[in-house]
């Protein structure tokens, strides 16, 4: 619903005039063309580092792990003002089948930009960059710094954002441009945690199957118990579907390398990969205790039931290696109110969702690390969609609006 609102000031108009929608689309398309799956972000980071430097920002490549890089840039203020981070991750979701075109060759149709990675979340990265460049090109004098963090590794625990915070980019506030919609500001979401459960058996030839212990059969019992498990928690009515968990992968075979040949041999090792979403009453420690309690009960019933819990998961598994805490940032925080106010200025509307939006608030993201570091933050980014992870797209009107809102928010924060 439209509401009374103040029009942009002359200074705001000066910044907004430096946002070229064609340039926004070109940058987004360039990013689509650079695949940057989790652990493979470096080529995209290097491209961005060069781009940001060419545009006049103070940019650097940070090596968060050997050979794994991310790009971070700063628009320096004159001093004495508040600093703000505009944050987006460059690692992208796994590629699903079913695409109707080449997923790394962007195309536009019906006001939507298509391409793999654009939704989660290269459109958000684009908005962050173009917002900062609008400020620089406007010539407006800022006292505080504006940081653009194009981080790696959000999809496996967010170690890129942690690295940025701990290596020179701790700001007074932050906006993470996750793709939840240009009229949505999220401040509350679940925590996330990955772990691996192993069951151990004893391999024997099928001719002596009775003498073996089948790790796969034991895992079937374990999965049934895990799915029925009641995780210890205090109910949060704003997140009614939490806690929740998902057994996402199961593999069993011979030995810890899962030799899948020789189906005539009883499996002696089986693993299941589990993701858990939880609220602020829970932690990694409480969840581990719940898993042990549940699996210990199976072991008490069955002397041949042997298990291990792997946490943190080995890096080679590509899972999150941290228990990312749930977040509940007060909507009264200045950065939240700035985004809300600038959305109203540009659209004439209040946000459709403020604080919690379901199911989006059941997802984890890097505001976890910012908030735990004492940095007030919120989620605000351009929305779009996908069908079973193929033909992923972003709504261009949302991308343009978010770019403008972020530019005015950074202007207000760093003025």
Mark where each language-model region is.
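A structural signal for isolated positions on well-ordered beta-strands in alpha/beta enzyme cores
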Residues: 60, 85, 147-149, 308
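Acidic/His- and Gly-rich active-site-bordering loop/insert found
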Residues: 2-114, 137-142
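Fold-level recognition of mixed alpha/beta catalytic cores in primary-metabolism enzymes, strongest
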Residues: 113, 118-119, 123-228, 237, ...
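A short, acidic/glycine-rich surface segment
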Residues: 93-95, 158-160, 182-185, 231-234, ...
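Metal-dependent amide/peptide-bond hydrolase catalytic core
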Residues: 1-9, 193-415
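A short linear hydrophobic-aromatic micro-motif
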Residues: 57-61, 184, 354-357
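Short acidic loop-to-helix transition motifs that present clustered carboxylates
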Residues: 65-69, 157, 181-182, 363-364
């Amino acid at each position: 619903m439209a509401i009374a609102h103040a029009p942009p000031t002359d200074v705001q108009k000066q910044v907004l005039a430096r946002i070229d929608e064609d340039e926004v689309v070109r940058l987004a398309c360039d990013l689509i063309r650079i695949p940057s799956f989790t652990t493979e972000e470096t080529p995209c980071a290097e491209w961005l580092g060069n781009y940001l430097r060419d545009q006049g920002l103070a940019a650097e490549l940070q090596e968060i792990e050997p050979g794994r890089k991310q790009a971070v840039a700063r628009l320096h203020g004159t001093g004495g003002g508040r600093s703000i981070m505009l944050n987006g991750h460059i690692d992208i979701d796994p590629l699903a089948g079913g695409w109707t075109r080449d997923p790394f060759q962007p195309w536009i149709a019906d006001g939507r930009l298509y391409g793999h990675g654009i939704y989660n979340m290269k459109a958000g990265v684009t908005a962050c960059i173009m917002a900062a460049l609008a400020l620089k090109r406007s010539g407006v004098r800022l006292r505080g710094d504006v940081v653009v963090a194009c981080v790696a590794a959000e999809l496996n625990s967010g170690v890129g954002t942690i690295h940025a915070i701990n290596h020179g980019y701790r700001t007074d506030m932050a906006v993470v441009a996750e793709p939840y919609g240009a009229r949505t500001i999220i401040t509350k979401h679940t925590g996330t945690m990955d772990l691996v459960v192993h069951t151990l058996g004893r391999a024997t030839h099928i001719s002596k199957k009775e003498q073996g212990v089948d790790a796969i059969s034991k895992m079937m019992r374990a999965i049934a118990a895990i799915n029925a498990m009641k995780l210890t928690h205090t109910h949060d009515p704003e997140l009614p579907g939490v806690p929740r968990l998902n057994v996402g992968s199961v593999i069993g075979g011979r030995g810890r390398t899962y030799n899948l040949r020789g189906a005539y041999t009883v499996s002696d090792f089986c693993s299941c990969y589990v993701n858990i979403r939880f609220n602020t009453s829970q932690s990694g420690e409480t969840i581990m205790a719940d898993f042990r309690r549940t699996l210990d009960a199976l072991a008490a019933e069955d002397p041949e039931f042997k298990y291990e819990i792997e946490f943190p998961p080995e890096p080679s598994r590509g899972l999150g290696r941290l228990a990312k805490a749930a977040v509940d940032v007060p909507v009264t925080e200045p950065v939240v109110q700035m985004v809300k106010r600038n959305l109203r200025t540009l659209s004439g509307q209040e946000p459709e969702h403020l604080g919690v939006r379901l199911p989006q608030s059941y997802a984890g993201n890097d505001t976890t690390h910012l908030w735990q570091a004492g940095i007030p933050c919120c989620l605000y980014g351009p929305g779009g969609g996908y069908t079973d992870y193929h033909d992923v797209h972003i709504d261009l009107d949302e991308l343009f609006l978010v770019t403008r809102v972020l530019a005015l928010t950074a202007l207000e924060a760093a003025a």
